[in-house]
Amino acid sequence: MSATTSEENPDSINYIGFNQDSKVICVGHKDGYMFYKTADILENNTLTYEGENLTHLGLNNCLIIERLFSSALMVVISQKDPRVLHVYHFTSRNIICDHRFNKSVLTVRLNRDRIVVCLEDCIYIYNLKDMKMMHNIMDTPTNKLGVLDLTSNPGNALIAYPGSTDTGSVHLFDAINLSSVSTFNAHEGTIACLKFNQEGNMIATASTKGTVIRVYSVPNGHRLFEFRRGVTRCVNIYSLCFSSDSKYLTSSSNTETVHVFKLEKTEGVDNKPEASTEGGGWFDAINKTFSAYMPSQVLQVGELMTTERSFATAKLPGAARSNQVSLVSHKNQQYVMAATSDGFVYAYRLDPEGGELDLIKQHNIGPKSDTSRASPTSTGSGGAAKSAEASNQSVPNMDDPDDFPPMSHTSG
């Protein structure tokens, strides 16, 4: 998401997005961050949030806020110096480490094994446990929008990013074994958005034209589904997201319409692989490994579904500067949830029959909202001393997957 400076709008939201499993909405603003639970958005009339003012740390105007699932570990990119990545533990109120780069950070993705940092022309990979750099992918095709995604399932860390500035190719890189996996042609135009499903065996893609959304199997790059939006005009696709069971895919754009596509198999349609692979026998081995975890619709790589219209749509009350959309599973029901940069979140119940979805919840979020803080952690003046004291009193457990210990180290 593009940032808006505080001079343009003192109360603006600079960043908004969902965490890896869509259980938390992350908001970055001029003074700090706010986290909202999606379950609270669906269940409560009044929202609470976890948040903190980070100005005492010099982190004014948070441009990127990413949280590791529902843990206390998060990363911050501040407008004070967008070339610096701050890894922060918000329970102990301690900066774990800083990593400085020679260009602005455009995108950050986390899973339980890796932190992946995307610059305009290179990608850095860090080990989450000790925050040490594992690898850097140099001289990547110019990626001014920071288009990149990382799988979130345990033990798997595939990175996807555009493979060309001229065509719509997608490159997959294994961030565990630190080696290239495959490259496949997804669109004629350049890639504008891409997103893995939660199992890491499918990826959705959209080009800068925005009229066609496709789904490919991972890692071999077979086209599984192709969806055409309901209008012919070009749009900017802001976000893509699979449901947790990979039965639905949703997209948002610079229009007021959110589209939901149903991932159903169609019998008797042949499809050819679109991947050019690297690694020979190694690729065959990893392909078999991934196949063991693929759902049935992914294994049927010969079956391609093409639809001219979305399965369901949701109308946003207005077109914001930007938005992010997700499919949230709550109490055996699927919901479409859209969070906008003008400080609103909208929830729609996904009807199994599709069609136009009804708005069931609407909340204000961000610094201008009337929400209350659930667990105040802001320190104000003297916050650094309190942070050190808090981290000494309660050291997080290294073996707890939802917690990681504060460590001190800075990379140049």
Swiss-Prot record:
Predominant location: membrane
Mutant phenotype after disruption: RNAi-mediated knockdown results in defective clearance of engulfed apoptotic cells. RNAi-mediated knockdown reduces autophagic degradation of membrane pore-forming toxin Cry5B. RNAi-mediated knockdown results in reduced germ stem cell proliferation during larval development. RNAi-mediated knockdown causes abnormalities in constitutive dauer formation in daf-2 e1370 mutant including a lack of autophagosome formation.
Pfam families, per database record: PROPPIN
Tissue localization of expression: Expressed in neurons and intestinal cells.
SMART domains reported for this sequence: WD40
Domain notes: The L/FRRG motif is required for recruitment to phosphatidylinositols including phosphatidylinositol 3-phosphate (PtdIns(3)P), phosphatidylinositol 4-phosphate (PtdIns(4)P), phosphatidylinositol 5-phosphate (PtdIns(5)P), and phosphatidylinositol 3,5-bisphosphate (PtdIns(3,5)P2).
Family to which this protein belongs: Belongs to the WD repeat PROPPIN family.
Cell location: Cytoplasmic vesicle, Phagosome membrane; Cytoplasm
Stated name of the protein: Autophagy-related protein 18
GO aspect biological process, one term: autophagy of mitochondrion
UniProt entry keywords in alphabetical sequence: Autophagy, Cytoplasm, Cytoplasmic vesicle, Lipid-binding, Membrane, Repeat, WD repeat
Known function: Component of the autophagy machinery that is recruited to phosphatidylinositols on preautophagosomal structures, which are early autophagic structures, to promote autophagosome formation, and the subsequent degradation and clearance of engulfed apoptotic cells and P-granules in somatic cells. In particular, binds with high affinity to phosphatidylinositols including phosphatidylinositol 3-phosphate (PtdIns(3)P), phosphatidylinositol 4-phosphate (PtdIns(4)P), and phosphatidylinositol 5-phosphate (PtdIns(5)P), and more weakly to phosphatidylinositol 3,5-bisphosphate (PtdIns(3,5)P2).
Short motif L/FRRG motif, span: 227-230
Low complexity bias: start-end ranges: 372-391
Residue ranges of the region described as Disordered: 363-412
Cellular component terms per the entry's GO annotation: cytoplasm; cytosol; phagocytic vesicle; phagocytic vesicle membrane; phagophore assembly site membrane
Membrane topology recorded in Swiss-Prot or TrEMBL: Peripheral membrane protein
Highest taxon above the source species: Eukaryota
Ranges occupied by WD repeats: 100-139, 142-183, 186-226, 232-271
UniProt GO molecular function: phosphatidylinositol-3,5-bisphosphate binding; phosphatidylinositol-3-phosphate binding; phosphatidylinositol-4-phosphate binding; phosphatidylinositol-5-phosphate binding; protein-macromolecule adaptor activity
Keyword Repeat: yes
